[in-house]
Each structure stands twice: as C-alpha cells, then as structure tokens.
C-alpha cells in the first residue's frame, strides 16, 4: 500500500507559463480517503518556497474538512448556541443574539469563515458606525451605532473567533488585526455633599426616604436595592445581606437572579439611623416580604421605576441631572474622602478587588495621597 503523504509534504515545480508552483497536502477526504491537494503560486522559486512553508504550517493547524463547512454566519450561530448562550445571563445572551442576527449576519455572514479577514471586520465596524441603526434615525440622532455598541460587537466576535482557532477551523483570529472604537469614559458625577439634604428631603416628601437613604450610605446597584427583602436585614448586627438582584430569566421574564460575581454577594454594615428607617418602613407593610414593595402592586419595584423616582426627586429638589448609578459613586467618593480605607469600600461595593476601586476613584485617592503627604510633611517638620 502506498504511503500517504503527510500534511505539509509539498513539492515545487516551474510551470509552462513561467510561474513557480508549490503543491501540498491539505488533508484527506473523510469518505474517500483521497488527498486534498492545494497549491500556491509565485514569480520566483524563493517566493513559492516561502508561501508553501506558510501554507503547510496552516494546513497542519487547521481541520480543512470542517473549516469548509462554515461561513461566519453559521459559525456564529453554532458558537452562540453551544458556548455563549448556556453560560450567559439573559440580557447578555439577548444582546449577543441581536448582534449576530441583526448586525453581523446580514452584512458579512456569507463570508467563508476561513477567508474572513481583519479588513472585513473593520469594514463592518465602519458600516455599523455610519448606518447601523435599524430604525430611521430620530431627529437629532446619528444613523449609526454608538462606539460602545460596536465595541461590544467586536468583543463578541473576538470570543467567537478565538473558539474557532481552538477548534482548528482557522489559523488565527482575524479580530486581532482590528482597531475597534475606543469607548469614551463617562464623566463621573456625584451628588455634592451640600445637596444631599435637599435630595433626601425631596425623597421623604415622596415617601421613599428609607430606600434612597440606604442607597446613599451603601452604594447598592439598583438591581440589588429593589431585590432586598425584610429577611436580609439583621437588626441586631446592623447589616444588610446582598445575595440577589432583579434581572430576567432565560425566558426573558422579570425574575430574581444571583449577582453577576461571587464578590457581589456580601454583607454591608449600615448605621443605626438606616436600621431605624427600615424598621419604620417595614411597619407600614409588615406582611410583605419585600423591603421596598411597590405601592401600586405590592411586589418588587422594577429597577427602571426606581430610576424614574430618582429623576423626580432631583426635579423636586431643583438639582441637576444625575444618573441613579452616580448615587453609588457618591457613596464611594464620600466614604473615601472621609477616611474609609479602599479595601473596605471595595468590599461594600462588591468589586472584584481593591485595585479596581482604586482605578475607578483615582481622583479621590489622589486627593487622599496629597492629604497624607501634607500630614507626613507636617509631622516631619515637627520632629526635625
């Protein structure tokens, strides 16, 4: 029986048209066992030799038969169902699905996976930035997608193509060659200390003081805040247990879910004033398990409803616009400025590590360093 030529055993010859050709074995047909021969062409023997070496290396690292089965669109669908969807929360999974079905597949989904280039992806990003909106642009709005949305699509593509490399469908990830848009940092704003009293007075007038007081002294995420139940409060130890958040289940229905990370599951110490407010709030609806039930339904507040109440409080108090999430920044900033150490603030916020907290609140920690330097300078001046 004749010996099969191994992948990469190529040969070079000069053709009648004057060009040089290198042939190599790209693999074997699974059904017939016959070799699959491919070639490279060049003007010189040296050029073909270089091309052949590269092609041979690629042939050894790619499952050619399987690679031919996929376009970008069919691979993304396979990756989504097998690797992404089972491990993602519903909002993220839905974001990926929409990105694939509405933005990527209609534009470049027919490109064979093995022929996809970084330039194809870069062109996609350009098109999405200029014409990405599915509905006609509203007055005053651009017709393209935002840089943050395009960056998210790039991240998804990069993950999907990394998996394709691992499964030997492509040699390397073409997304590595792209320059995705940079996301401009959102300007961090906080509620100035001198405005906190006005804010809380307006909250009290709307009957939601306990909820927003707790937010300002804990920095809870809105999904964590509305998911709190009376059983999460330990009156004796003056702590709040954070172990769940408002979210959506795999069917897309509102539901209670676990926080995103293990670090988000935590106990937060609160002052006695907060405990007293929460106890008084519970006495208004002693049989209701929710700490802050909706007055309309008696059920858990929808996170968006809390955001709307926050906007009304700002308006009532005559204060400038501030995102609800900025109340979390307000807590962290004021805690750091008042001497609470970074590690403690980080654990209260449910951050992955204190380093992330340091990077997020650099402006505050820089002020703390300057204050520490001044104190040390004063101390050294006294001892010298």
Each PLM stretch: what is its role?
Residues 1-2, 201, 237, 248-276, ...:
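C-terminal secondary-structure termini that scaffold catalytic or DNA-interacting sites
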Residues 166, 209, 213, 217-224, ...:
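C-terminal catalytic core of tyrosine-transesterase DNA break-rejoin enzymes
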Residues 98, 190-194, 237, 245-248, ...:
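Active-site/catalytic core of tyrosine-dependent DNA strand-transfer enzymes
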Residues 43, 182, 190, 246-248, ...:
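Catalytic-site neighborhood detector that most strongly recognizes the C-terminal catalytic loop/helix
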Residues 232-239, 321, 340-362, 370:
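Short, polar N-cap/turn motifs at the start of nucleic acid-interacting alpha helices
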Residues 15-21, 25-123, 281-291:
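N-terminal DNA-binding module of tyrosine recombinases/phage integrases
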Residues 134-147, 151-155, 166-230, 235-236, ...:
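Basic, Lys/Arg- and aromatic-enriched nucleic-acid-binding interface segment
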Residues 116, 148, 152, 299, ...:
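Short basic/aromatic active-site micro-motif
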